[in-house]
């Protein structure tokens, strides 16, 4: 009998590093997690220590193997998934970062973005990278490091510095500096990668004064990039065989590999991705065009929309409004009333994301009457997550011309049955909740396992993607449209607040 083999997924997130071990049936055998330091040098700036990212990630790998009693020679391959856009620049001779990692949330490069807009590059960037000009993405962060760290620009010109998103940094460290690589999904979040030619965009690199020599080689999301020796000296060499940015890994983990398949991750915010296959769809409705994974981990296209306030709006009910003791109680209180009684909550606390992109909108509660109680507000806040999701899905359908047949869901809020049912009702499509909700890690593991032949193909994996529950839509069409029109009116109120202020 052959000895059992496993796949390891390294899930490097914004607040913690995790390692997940899966067996051949795609069951999770062991998980280990370590949080790391969030650094806020000044308002709007967010950093991580790249060495701490690597230290926490490598220690979770060792811990999770020890916890499960699995030897390193039983690992068939390692897959990596990571927080996207976060930017690291290091010296390839010393292996030391020249500055902290600048995190995706960091807004310090807003001025550089304004200059790109003034230079008339907005349309070029949208057409060739699929993105909007925003400090969120890596390109302007690289420029900031080269412009502000002493000696960095000279070293970069001399070919001594390397750039990487978190996946690139981890692979470089795990292969002792032998491999400088990223995958298409992570490259597509830098704002300097051309998604038409699948090459670094030399015009944008020149505009931002970034030497091409710094940039990693870009490969598919499922192939052997290099090997790592996790047992130390004389230990086993294990192939690193899968890489994908966290949202694209979740899309793959949900088996959304064909045109028109979509998933929504309900976290602090919501991330919706729809696979558009080989067809690049340029959004006219405020969505991003990005790269995802095709059936074999090759580059395919996707539309992406982000909702800023998902689970965070429930935390607001708990922490600021004191209407809940525990976020999990929201379902119980929401079902204590038959409807939201005409109340709408628009949680635009930091403006509105896709498809509105309105930084000046503010949180609003409308439709209050004397009969409104706390349960109506709790229910309306949960409903707002579903309405915002519909806003993005409608934009995706308009851009792609593809009618959604079902929505696959993951993330913390999917445990809320009321929200999932209301989501199905609002969209008029079935909502599928998987049994294993660790879909980001699953995606990275699937990509690595397929690359080394651990799994035969997608057909074999599809049989392992068990749905825990499907929520079928119940509302009649008149009621659905009436409620959604009410939501649209409420959004207009949230957007009008700043306009009214300007008129004073």
From Swiss-Prot:
Sn-glycerol 3-phosphate binds at residues 14, 84-85, 136, 246. It catalyses: glycerol + ATP = sn-glycerol 3-phosphate + ADP + H(+). ATP binds at residues 14-16, 268, 311, 315, 412. Pfam families: FGGY_C, FGGY_N. Its EC number is 2.7.1.30. One of its GO terms (cellular component) is cytosol. It is an enzyme of class 2 (transferase). ADP binds at residues 14, 18, 268, 311, 412, 416. Keywords: ATP-binding, Glycerol metabolism, Kinase, Nucleotide-binding, Transferase. Inhibited by fructose 1,6-bisphosphate (FBP). One of its GO terms (molecular function) is ATP binding. PROSITE patterns: FGGY_KINASES_1, FGGY_KINASES_2. InterPro entries: ATPase_NBD (IPR043129), Carb_kinase_FGGY (IPR000577), Carb_kinase_FGGY_CS (IPR018483), FGGY_C (IPR018485), FGGY_N (IPR018484), Glycerol_kin (IPR005999). Pathway: Polyol metabolism; glycerol degradation via glycerol kinase pathway; sn-glycerol 3-phosphate from glycerol: step 1/1. HAMAP family: Glycerol_kin. Belongs to the FGGY kinase family. This is Glycerol kinase. It comes from Aliivibrio salmonicida (strain LFI1238) (Vibrio salmonicida (strain LFI1238)). The gene is glpK.
């Amino acid at each position: 009998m052959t000895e059992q083999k496993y796949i390891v997924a390294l899930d490097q997130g914004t607040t913690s590093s995790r390692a997940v071990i899966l067996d051949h049936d795609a069951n999770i055998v062991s998980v280990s997690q370590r949080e790391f330091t969030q650094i806020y040098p000044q308002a709007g700036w967010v950093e991580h220590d790249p060495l701490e990212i690597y230290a926490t990630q490598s220690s979770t790998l060792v811990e999770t193997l020890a916890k499960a009693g699995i030897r390193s020679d039983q690992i068939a391959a390692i897959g990596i998934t990571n927080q996207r856009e976060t930017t690291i620049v290091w010296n390839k001779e010393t292996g030391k970062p020249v500055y902290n990692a600048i995190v995706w949330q960091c807004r310090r490069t807003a001025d550089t973005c304004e200059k790109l807009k003034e230079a008339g590059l907005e349309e070029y960037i949208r057409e060739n990278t699929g993105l909007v000009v925003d400090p969120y993405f890596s390109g302007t962060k690289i420029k900031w490091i080269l412009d502000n760290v002493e000696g960095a620009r000279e070293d970069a010109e001399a070919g001594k510095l390397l750039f990487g998103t978190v996946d690139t940094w981890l692979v470089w460290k795990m292969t002792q500096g032998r491999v400088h690589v990223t995958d298409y999904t992570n490259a597509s979040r830098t704002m300097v990668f051309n998604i038409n030619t699948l090459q670094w965009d030399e015009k944008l690199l020149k505009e931002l004064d970034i030497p091409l020599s710094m940039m990693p080689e870009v490969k598919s999301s499922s192939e052997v990039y290099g090997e790592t020796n996790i047992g130390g000296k004389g230990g086993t060499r294990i192939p690193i065989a899968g890489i994908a940015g966290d949202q694209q890994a979740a899309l793959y983990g949900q088996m959304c590999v064909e045109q028109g398949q979509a998933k929504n991750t309900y976290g602090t915010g919501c991330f919706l991705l729809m696979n558009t296959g080989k067809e690049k769809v340029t959004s006219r409705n405020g969505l991003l065009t990005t790269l995802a994974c095709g059936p074999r981990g090759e580059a395919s296209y996707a539309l992406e929309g982000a909702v800023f306030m998902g689970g965070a709006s429930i935390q607001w009910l708990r922490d600021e409004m004191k209407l809940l003791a525990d976020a999990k109680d929201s379902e119980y209180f929401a079902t204590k009333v038959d409807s939201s009684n005409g109340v709408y909550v628009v949680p635009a606390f930091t403006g509105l994301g896709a498809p509105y992109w309105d930084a000046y909108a503010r949180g609003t509660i409308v439709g209050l009457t004397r009969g409104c109680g706390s349960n109506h507000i709790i229910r309306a806040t949960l409903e707002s997550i579903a309405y915002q999701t519909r806003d993005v899905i409608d934009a995706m359908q308009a851009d792609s011309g593809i009618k959604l047949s079902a929505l696959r869901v993951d993330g913390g809020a999917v445990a809320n049955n009321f929200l999932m049912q209301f989501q199905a009702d609002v969209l008029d499509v079935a909502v599928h909740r998987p049994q294993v909700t660790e879909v980001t890690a699953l995606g990275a593991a699937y990509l690595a396992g397929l690359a080394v032949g651990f799994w035969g193909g997608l057909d074999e994996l599809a049989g392992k993607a068990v749905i825990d529950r499907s929520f079928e839509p119940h509302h009649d069409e008149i009621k659905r449209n009436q409620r959604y029109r009410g939501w649209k009116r409420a959004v207009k109120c949230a957007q009008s607040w700043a306009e009214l202020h300007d008129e004073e």
